[in-house]
Swiss-Prot record:
Tree of life domain: Bacteria
CDD domains: GrpE
Any one GO molecular function term: protein-folding chaperone binding
Keywords: Chaperone, Cytoplasm, Stress response
Family the UniProt entry places it in: Belongs to the GrpE family.
Gene: grpE
Protein name per UniProt: Protein GrpE
Summary of the function given for this chain in its UniProt record: Participates actively in the response to hyperosmotic and heat shock by preventing the aggregation of stress-denatured proteins, in association with DnaK and GrpE. It is the nucleotide exchange factor for DnaK and may function as a thermosensor. Unfolded proteins bind initially to DnaJ; upon interaction with the DnaJ-bound protein, DnaK hydrolyzes its bound ATP, resulting in the formation of a stable complex. GrpE releases ADP from DnaK; ATP binding to DnaK triggers the release of the substrate protein, thus completing the reaction cycle.
One GO location term (cellular component): cytoplasm
Length: 207
């Protein structure tokens, strides 16, 4: 074999080696180029899926928390309404009970007032009658004080015009000095409990 042939073979071998080496480099670099063009790694795909799963779960938990909050507010409002209703019912029951007591007590007060209206004047009282009359006056004073503490007020009558919301006319008389329907006398005192009439005043009015 001549030197020329050997040189050509050697050159050809080197050329083949270069081609093979170039092929190995291209084979190794192609996946890297493709990876950089948007392919995701398995680890990245797993992380993104987990994040999406957690976000979905967080949204569900927020929605559930909102429902619990709305339910809690509704129950709190229901309880507050129930409490206020019971307070109103208790106040109304207490007011009705007080009103019933006052209604039963008013005839006693009427009798005490009539007794004192017909009692002798202080200067005319005998030594025997004076202690009893003074005792009745003390009872009347205490009863009126108790009524005042409970918010009970007597209805103004004499000298005012008849008002059917507060007065009940039981008689009419001629009275030159009074206008028609003006109250000139009171037969029975009327009372208010707060702003509610618990007994109308029975009055006599001018024609």
């Amino acid at each position: 074999m001549t030197k020329k042939v050997m040189d050509e073979q050697e050159s050809h071998k080197e050329y083949l080696d270069e081609i093979l080496q170039a092929g190995e480099v291209q084979e190794d670099t192609v996946p890297l180029v493709e990876w950089s063009q948007g392919q995701s790694s398995p680890e990245g795909e797993c992380t993104e899926a987990r994040i999406a799963e957690l976000e979905t779960e967080l949204a569900r938990q927020k929605e559930q928390a909102g429902k619990y909050r709305d339910e809690l507010l509704r129950r709190a409002a229901d309880f507050e309404n129930f409490r206020k209703q019971k307070e109103r019912e208790a106040m109304m029951a207490s007011s009705r009970a007080l009103e019933n007591i006052i209604r039963e007590l008013l005839p006693v007060i009427d009798d005490v007032k009539r007794l004192l209206d017909h009692a002798p004047l202080s200067a005319e009282r005998s030594s025997e009658a004076r202690p009893y009359i003074e005792g009745v006056e003390m009872v009347k004073k205490n009863l009126e004080k108790w009524l005042d503490e409970k918010g009970v007020k007597a209805i103004a009558s004499i000298g005012t015009m008849l008002d059917v919301n507060f007065h009940e006319a039981i008689s009419q008389i001629d009275s030159p000095d009074a206008e028609p329907d003006m109250i000139v006398d009171e037969y029975q005192t009327g009372y208010l409990l707060g702003e509610r009439v618990i007994r109308h005043a029975k009055v006599i009015v001018a024609r």
